[in-house]
Amino acid sequence: MLDFMDYIQLAFAEGTNWNRDNSYSSLTATAQSLLDFSTPERLRVHLSSLSTPNFATSYTLGTVGLIDGSVSYLYSTVPFTNTPSRSALIPLRKLSPGYRQVAPPSAPIEDWNLDSILDNPQNVQPSFASKPTLLHATLHLPPPTTLNALFLRRISPTMHLTLAVCSTRGPPLSKSAPQASLLMQLSHDTGKYSNEYLFSTDNALFGWRGLWNFGPDPRSSTDTAAPRLSLLSAGAEAYYSPVSSLIGMSTGLRFSTLPAATDVPASTATGFATANQSTPISTFPYTLTLTLTPLTGSLSTTYSLRASPNLAFSSRFGFNVYSWESEMVAGCELWRKSRKQDDGLEWARRKMRASEPLSLPSLPAESKERQEEEEATDSVLKIRVDQSWNVRVLWEGRVKELLVSAGVGLGPSDTAFAWMYIFSVRAGLNR
């Protein structure tokens, strides 16, 4: 389950219209969410708050064996007025990553009109209207004290700058300066392709990541053009450190259906469409990826599909051409809808729906209703198993006003363990 600060950072990316899917680092995001989730190993309590539309705080306390905690603060020039901040109102799918529908590439917005994006024209400051900025700092206690700081800034409609600092205090009797490292990342996204340039002071590491989308350029597409049904992307990454002579590289492909592929054509709203026209291009969304690391000889393929709005499956097969070792992992997630309050009028609604003509429903209304139905979930169950019969089970859901995560890991050589992880968000009480 995502921390509250990570949730706010995702809201910042969505509010500033930054496409997280158009990046090589997100090539296998869906498979990683379904197969590489971790089960909690200790009791941890989070108390977070969005005290103002621009300022958020978070406190963490961990127990069982070792008591530790952290204090986090976040400030954004973009207000989060319309972002749900109470644990009872936040959609669970925002906090528990699962199958993620890849968004179609879009052209960058040349005129940043954040007033219309966030529907909050009163609180947007003109000095930051063109360059949204986010500041985040976390102090981990007890000693050794670690400070993590993050700086995000949209330099231009196509440029995104990220600065991350990590500093760890040395032993109490040591007179040496605290160890610190800086990671700088500059992202450039045009919709058709994206590039990321990285530099880390740790071993003077330089890096590059790039992604190319096949098909028409969204910058030259018109509003009357037919929506794309699928997306094929190719990308690569490379790293080099002159200090440690470290070299790394990988390449990958991704094919994914887009939302338009599973939608019923608009011509069916009139009721005169043929049988072929009323059938969607794909019965369910799916994503396929292929990644290759030439230096280590590792090859990995993933296949993820969303069989229904509340059920998703994923599998991964990895093979090493040098050692002949292989890996097979399979997993799924099952969402549970929240029970609707029965007002005794469901019989009347069914009768009204049966008597309505076929021309009344429209595609936007169906899409909105489907989205609201998907967000009306209060728990999710994730299961994964590998070729060695190591099983992980994770449950995340709501208990009263708390968001709770509990998991168990079972294996032939490991003792079973089960810990509970509690994540509580109590915010917006003063607004």
Swiss-Prot record:
It is a multi-pass membrane protein. Keywords: Membrane, Mitochondrion, Mitochondrion outer membrane, Transmembrane, Transmembrane beta strand. It is found in: Mitochondrion outer membrane. One of its GO terms (biological process) is phospholipid transport. Residues 358-377 are annotated as: Disordered. It holds the Pfam family MDM10. One of its GO terms (cellular component) is ERMES complex. PANTHER family: MITOCHONDRIAL DISTRIBUTION AND MORPHOLOGY PROTEIN 10 (PTHR28035:SF1). Component of the ERMES/MDM complex, which serves as a molecular tether to connect the endoplasmic reticulum and mitochondria. Components of this complex are involved in the control of mitochondrial shape and protein biogenesis and may function in phospholipid exchange. mdm10 is involved in the late assembly steps of the general translocase of the mitochondrial outer membrane (TOM complex). Functions in the tom40-specific route of the assembly of outer membrane beta-barrel proteins, including the association of tom40 with the receptor tom22 and small TOM proteins. Belongs to the MDM10 family. Component of the ER-mitochondria encounter structure (ERMES) or MDM complex, composed of mmm1, mdm10, mdm12 and mdm34. Associates with the mitochondrial outer membrane sorting assembly machinery SAM(core) complex. Lacks alpha-helical transmembrane segments, suggesting that it resides in the membrane via beta-sheet conformations similar to those predicted for other outer membrane proteins and porin. This is Mitochondrial distribution and morphology protein 10. It comes from Aspergillus oryzae (strain ATCC 42149 / RIB 40).
